[in-house]
Curated annotation (Swiss-Prot):
This is Boophilin-G2. The keyword Repeat applies. The keyword Secreted applies. It is found in: Secreted. The modification Pyrrolidone carboxylic acid is found at residue 16. Interacts with host thrombin and trypsin. The N-terminus is blocked.
Length: 142
């Protein structure tokens, strides 16, 4: 009986802590274009969306790593969005169509290294990573 109570308490605590992961992406009521991540329950992955800067809900993370810690990390390299080498590693760096100034990483096929570039916050291509580690995990292991 004590075992069942413990399981019920732990299950309730876990569900409350991560219940926000089931919320849909919510850009909020303001009009900024801030790149953020939310946990997409349909794909089971953290996905980028544009946040307006105010309002919204708790399924809103500054980095893909924060989203994965809270809601679930991919189990394999191929679980990353854009993990296909041809689309996720071969294209040249693309700053996109917005005017943000975000430091990102891309895989440079000529040098065989992950390098920094400035991302505008929207558009671009899949060769766009939050960190050098993520870039290397996806592109150097293929």
């Amino acid at each position: 009986m004590k075992y069942l109570i413990l399981l019920a308490v732990l299950g309730t605590a876990f569900a409350q802590r991560n219940g926000f992961c089931r919320l849909p992406a919510d850009e909020g009521i303001c009009k900024a274009l801030i790149p953020r991540f939310y946990f997409n329950t349909e794909t089971g992955k953290c996905t980028m969306f544009s946040y307006g800067g105010c309002g919204g809900n708790e399924n809103n993370f500054e980095t893909i790593e924060d989203c994965q810690k809270a809601c679930g990390a991919p189990e394999r390299v191929s679980d990353f969005e854009g993990a296909d080498f041809k689309t996720g590693c071969e294209p040249a760096a693309d700053s996109g169509s917005c005017a943000g100034q975000l430091e990102r990483w891309f895989y440079n096929v000529r040098s065989g290294e992950c390098e920094t570039f400035v991302y505008g916050g929207c558009g671009g291509n899949d060769n766009n990573y939050e960190s050098e580690e993520e870039c290397e995990l996806v592109c150097k292991n293929m």
